[in-house]
Every structure is written in structure tokens, then in C-alpha cells.
Amino acid sequence: MQKTLILAEKPSQLREYVKALGGFTQKGDYYESDRYIASSALGHLIELAEDTAYRPAGKWDKSYLPLVPPLNSYVYEPKRNDEGRQAHLKKLAQLFNNPNIAMIYVATDSDREGELIFRYIYHYFNCKLPYKRIWLSALDYSEIRQAFAAPKYKQGDPFLENLSKSAYARAITDWLIGANATQAATLQLGGDKLLSIGRVQTAILKIVCDRYLKNKAHKKTYTYKLITSHSYNGVAYTTESPIYESKAQAEQLLSSLATAHSFVSFQRKTERKNPPLLHTLDSLTIVANKLYKYTAAEVLASAQRLYEGKLTSYPRTEDAYITEEGYNKLKGFLPNLVNQCLNIANFTFPASLPASVNGAKITGSHDALVPTGQTNGIEKLSQQDQRIYTLILHRCLESFSEAAIYEKGVYEFENQGTSFKTHTSNLVQEGWKKYSPKVKVATADEDDSEEDTNFILQLPYKQGDKVTVEKKNLKEIESKPPAIYTPASLTEDLCNLSKFLQEQSPEVYAELQSEFNLKGLTVGTDGTRPNIIEQLVTIRKYIAFEKNKYIPTELGLQFYNAIKDIEVVNVAQTARLEYQLKQVAEGRISVTDYYNRLTDYVKSTVAQIFSLQSAITASTRKGLGTCPACKKGQIVEYEKSYGCSDYKNGCKYSIWKEIAHKKLTAKNIEDLLQKGKTSLIKGFKSKTGSDFEAYLVLDKDLKPAFQFNSKKK
């Protein structure tokens, strides 16, 4: 009997499929049942080959730049420096070539990256088997069973083809810009330093540096307004004049005030503040940083764990809406869930559909971030994961509640020709605000919302009534510099490129808006931005993260100043690339047309970099020890490995950052190189998934090898 091969993206996902579908027996790295053989990809098993596949062997050199392979000549190869993944790929090849397999069910993550992982493997194996696409928004067992009973997409579906093309276009864009611009910058400006340029990371670096420099260059200016104090029936209140640029004018007006105001009018209006939409990953990041100072990477990690624990839906979503079907499902369990988790009883849903329930507005691959209704494991969550989970619950309650309604009032007075006003605000219907998270961590660049402060004042004055001025003074208002970015404010700008450009660069915004619609464009994606920002801090060392603020380092500022005027750093060019990638995803332009534009841009970028003169002198990476291979360079930390600093002269020695599912620290590598042996490292995982501990030493081929504790019984 022929069977269907299930391909998951990672082992944890695979185990959930196996449990949900039932009837499986484990056979080494895969599972088998009467209908299925199931395995996982261990994430990315195949990747685009390094630049050495297209250029002469040896060290980097300007002579072969720009390096632009023909579109159809890109080489795919097994994941580099990862023997575990390479060995797994060989086992997976046996399953793909198994004559008993008649169909593949693609069950990698239901997003662009998950599609790319499968397509790379499928083409690398030159596989001809038909396939269907499993599409999941959550890992609860009922949804898994439904998805496998009726796969959402068949091979060749236009949505899948556009998704695949978009993923491939992004991959070759990042490869082409990264390989060319990084080598050009390193050769032209770096001296002995690697200077990394990337489509998204360099745009983020520019945005952070621009804001920091504006903050530091800010020169204080002052404006002025008159404040008068009054009381009625024991209730004190103040009135304020308009703002004046001239202190002398304000002082003259203050001195000329009469002893009493004349009452002019009272204007009342009702204001509605509608509930927020459901959480996307970006909105969750913004709230979590404002409340708990978590970074985007920390929020993503928590959201991913909650998803893998079947507690919430798929985290990498850009949509804040759900379908009516999804809403009805939530109505079935949300009141009991929030009673259990938040101690909120008797929650009731509104009579009409909330604004966040609108399937027609779902433009991406996934609905908004919501709970699944599962409760197993909630009590075991870490504090961070628990906080993120409760934020998702709170947002559901907020989104499914009535509007908050305020009664606003303005009392206006006049004194010697100067207008004075006092404002009142009364929250008459709490609505969704009743369910807002109560925890608040204040940040220096946040102002309290005026509408959330109740000030009820009832004055019985009639027009012309005199109101005694009990006290008067001049208030000096100091101008504020643009606030240095926090994870919240940076995410807000990166996920709304249109608003960012409109506020920060109106001329650029107008120019771009005349070319195309900026709505919906972002810098990078919600799934990639957190890790790119983290790399700028921990790997590139271009940005420091201090006291919840992103501050460029000396190296970051030097690099920014050297390249700030070239096209690859221009946020307008980032917007153009994002728009073109969006067109590919929507099937409006072909990958070929896009690639032709991209290669012209890359060639221009390399030429611009080679015209630069400023050398980068700031220190970048700490040497952890002498390279054991060439004996010349230092082993330093890179994005995915610890490698030789003398790479430009051909030394390719490196130690992969993750061995047996355990990330190695810089201290581990330092001990290995300088002492010949690490301290005892716990948390390695065997191929069967068992935990073990060991020392690391270098074998005769200079590769890390396990040395087990002989004293352990």
C-alpha cells in the first residue's frame, strides 16, 4: 500500500502531528502509520551556496565585483558547517525516494519561510512527487486533524506559487545585496574588519543612527504660556492661555491681566474611542515593550513557545482580523478561559460583530494572534511567557468590547483680550478600557494620554460672569528632542513605513507616493525584524541596547557616516524594494522582471561603495583565541559561527555556534582555544532527543569533539 509523506518543519511540530493523527510507530528519525510516513526538515536543510560558487577561489577581491549570477544559475547546497543537518538530509532523501510514497503533505510552517524550506528540499532532490499543502493557524489537535483531512492547497495553486516566488525573490535579494555590498564595503572601508551590509539591517541602522544624532544635536528652545489659578466650591482648577514664542510678549500679557476673567462659553462634546484590533506580532511587541521592556526578539520567542505549546495561534502574523467562524469558536471558550487565567468573570460579547471580525480584511497567510482555548501547560509557563499570554487574552477582551465613551468639555474665559481655557474629561462608559492590562512601566519618551485622566468640573457661570484670578504665573515649556528609539517605538516605525516617511521625510514621502501606494509597506517582515535587530546588537555590534534604548556604537556611527549617502542605506530605496517584492507576492510582476531591476541596483551599489573613502577604525570584535588552523588570525564571533578573522586571506576555519542543539557561548570557545577544553556543558541533545552533558575538545582535524565525564556514574 502506497503512503503519503508528511514533512514538518521541526521535530516539535512533527510530534504534535503524530499525536493528533494517531496510530504512528517511531522508526528512528521518522514515524510511520498505515497511511503516513512522517518526518521533519529540522528547519533550513538547504540554502543558497556561498559566493565561492560563482567566483575564483581565494580571498575576496574587487576584481570580480559586482557578482551577479544569472537568475537560473543559483546553486543550492546542504546547510554549511552543520553535520547533523547534513546527515538528516541524507535520511530525508531516502524517504523522498521511497517507492511506496505516492504523495507529499507539506506541513512546514504556514508562511513564506515554511514554503521556501520545502521548495528548496523538493528541488534539491529533483523530486517529481505530487504534493498538497497543509495550512495551519494553530497546533491544537482538532485543527491538525481537520487540516490533514482536507489539505487547503493543491500543487500549482496560484497562492502557493506567488508565495514561493516571493520567498525566493526575498532570498536572492538578501543574498545578492549582502554578498556584494558586504564584500565591497569590507574591501573599500574595512581594513581588517568585516563590514556587513544587508537590505533590512542597514536600513534599520540608518533609522536608529538618524534618530540618535537628531536627539544629540537638539538645541533647547522655549515657548511660554500663562497659567491662572481659580476655585469653585472648594474645587481648584487652572486655566491656560495659548502658547507664545516670545517670553517678553508673554510677560507683558501676564503683567497686564485684570484681577478677574470674564466667562465666555462652555462647549461640550461626546467622544468615542473604539476598541483596538486584535494583536499582530508587531502590536504585541509594542505593548509588551511598553509594559515589561521586552525586546522584539524576546516577544517573538515567547509567542513561538506559546504556539508550539498549542496555547495560541501562529505568531508571525501581520493581520489584526479573524473570520466570523474563528470568532464563534472564541465565543465558545473565551469567558471561561479569562475567568481561569485573569480572574475576570461574566465577560459578555457585544451584540454586533466587533471591527476585528472581518475575513475580507485578512490579507496575509494568517489571522490575528488569539488563544486556542487549550489550557494544558498554562501553569508551567515562565513569567515572561505567562505575561505575553495574558496580553493576548487582554487584547481579545478589549477588541470584543464596546467603545469607551468620554464627555469632554472646554470652559473658555477672556482677560484683557487674551483667551484662557480649561478642559474637562469624564469617562462615562468604560467599555474596552475595563480590560486593558493594569501594569504600567513608565518610559521617559511617553506622555500619559490626556483622555485617560478624568477631570470633572461643573461651573455654573453665565456669559460675562467674573471669575477671580487667585494666582497667575508664567509657564516655560522646554522643547523635547526626538526620543531615542525603544523596541516599541522602533517597531512602530518599521512596521508602518508610510507613516514613518510622512512624519520624518515629507518630501521623500511625496516623491514615493507619486510612484506607488506606500500603504502596508514595512521594513522587513514581522518574522524577520526581531532577529535582525538582535544581530545588529549582539553580532554586528553596530547598536547597543541600554536601558530599553537602542544607541549606535562607535563602530555603528562610523559605518553609518561612511555609507549614509549611498543608495543601499536610503530608506526610500528600501520602500521601493519592499513594493517590488510585494508585487512579486501578488503576482503582478515576474521574478525575472524583478531580478533585472535588482541586478541594476546591485551594480550601482557596488560602484557607489567603491567611490567612498572613509576608513572604519573603530574596534569591532573581541578575539577569543588564535586560529588553530592558520595560526595568524583570531577566532571571533560571527552571526552563525565563530570563525577566523583572516577570512579575506582564505582561512575558512570556523566552529558552528550550535552543536547538538546547544548554543555555544563566547566563553566556551575562549576556553576551548586557550585551555584546550571547555568547562562541562549541559543541555546537549542526542539524535534520539535525550539530554546529555560533555566537555568539548578539538580532535586531530581541529573539529569540536565530545569528551564525557569519566567520573560520572
Feature-to-residue mapping (PLM):
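Intrinsically disordered, low-complexity regulatory segments
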Residues: 1-171, 175, 481
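Basic, low-complexity terminal or inter-domain segments flanking catalytic cores
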Residues: 2-5, 24, 80, 93-96, ...
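Metal- or metallocofactor-binding catalytic centers and their adjacent structured scaffolds
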Residues: 246-279, 285
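C-terminal or mid-to-C-terminal helical accessory/interaction module adjacent to the motor/catalytic core
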Residues: 99, 143-230, 268-269
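Conserved short loop/turn motifs at secondary-structure junctions
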Residues: 2-5, 107-110, 191-194, 268-276, ...
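Amphipathic alpha-helical transducer elements in NTP-driven molecular machines
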Residues: 11-18, 35-38, 42, 82-93, ...
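Active-site phosphate-binding and catalytic loops of NTP-dependent enzymes
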Residues: 25-29, 155-161, 183-187, 213-218, ...
